[in-house]
Amino acid sequence: MKKRVITFTLLSCMSLLFIQGKTNCKYEKKIADYNYIIGTQTIGAKYKFTNETNLVETAKAIRAMGSNLLKMSMSPRYFWENYDIPKNESICSLTDLAKEKNMKQVFDLDFKYYQIWAYEFSQYVVEPEGQKKDENQIQFINGLSDYDSIRCYREIYDLAAHLLKTYSGTGKVFMLGNWEGDWHLRWDYDRTKPANPKTIEGMTRWLRVRQKAVDDAKKIIPHKNVSLFYYVEVNLSDLALDGKECVINSILPNLNPDYVSFSSYTATNPPRSETEMEKTLTTHLNYIESKMKPKSGIEGKRLFIGEYGWPELGFYSNEPSYRSPEEINKRAKWVIKTAVKWGCPFVLWWEMYNNELTNDGKNRGFWLINDKGEKTPLYNTHKEFYLESKVFLREYVKRNKKMPSESEFRSAAIKFKSLN
């Protein structure tokens, strides 16, 4: 009898441990996949430290920092401006590029979230050797033709279909979008003159076509446990607040994208204190959101910060000649806390490795790891934030046997030691 009781007790304990283990595993997966809001990106890195392509090296560095989000670029410039991936003449579309071994390698890494600048090969006009012309990436200046509209739709649809089929069952979240839309609308970079009405019309059509291609792929392609969204990026919010023509005022109200990205330099560069940052950035975020139509099926706010940042070395007349890494870290914390409090689903620093050079060839210092391989204070802020977040989530689960609400996480996050 005693032996039977001991055996029963042992089996009961083992069963309890098994159940607890299953419970812990369930929550650990949710913790690994959690949206930690803050992150970074890798586009156009000017240096590297391994024999891998700069895309793969920087993606691994971002993952090693603790981020489960990767922002990157896919375009016909993959081999010279964006990355040092070897040129391959057989790559003629975004889907071809998605199958390229370096691209596939980063898609196979254990990132949960991917944000991708997606520019169609079918819309691209090759630049003269050694020249970069952003207008060559688009065909909607003075209007988008039916021919280019059809080609645009087909290429984005095919990429969307490929991602849904290839990564079905992985739980990954893909977001396709564009770089700073106002510099497509004003492709000559002249913000002083009115936007061309025909270009406004053409850009509106381009963005609608891309959203429809994503929507149609999601309806038609069988898939499970993989998500795909489309976003539009805006940037000249100061013009918007002045009532001038820009993507926010002239195009966004006529669209209904899944998400909107704000490349936020016009809001985040001027403030000189945390109080001023919170007031200014909140004003800009509120204004942009006021131009967005509501959309069912997506929880939470749909406006995020796709870029913010400051280089160590100044270049333009409206910026200091030098900012210390400590000053940059302090300012970044202002942005993060304001955006987290406001409800931005993502807040992305520009960027992991620097991409801009001074006239004499020096790295300007848009980085979390510098050109000597040194990690900046802001790198450590990100790393520590991820660690604190996981501690908070595990302790919350232990107490409550469930994950926290988004608002509970945000309320806790702005008080983390890493941000204060």
Give the location of each predicted region:
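Aromatic-lined carbohydrate-recognition surfaces of secreted/lumenal glycan-active proteins
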Residues: 173-179, 204-244, 298-311, 347-352
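Bacterial Sec-dependent N-terminal signal peptides
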Residues: 1-26
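Active-site clefts of carbohydrate-active enzymes
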Residues: 183-192, 264, 294-332, 349-368
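Alpha-helical scaffolding within the catalytic cores
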Residues: 53-58, 94-104, 236-251, 282-292, ...
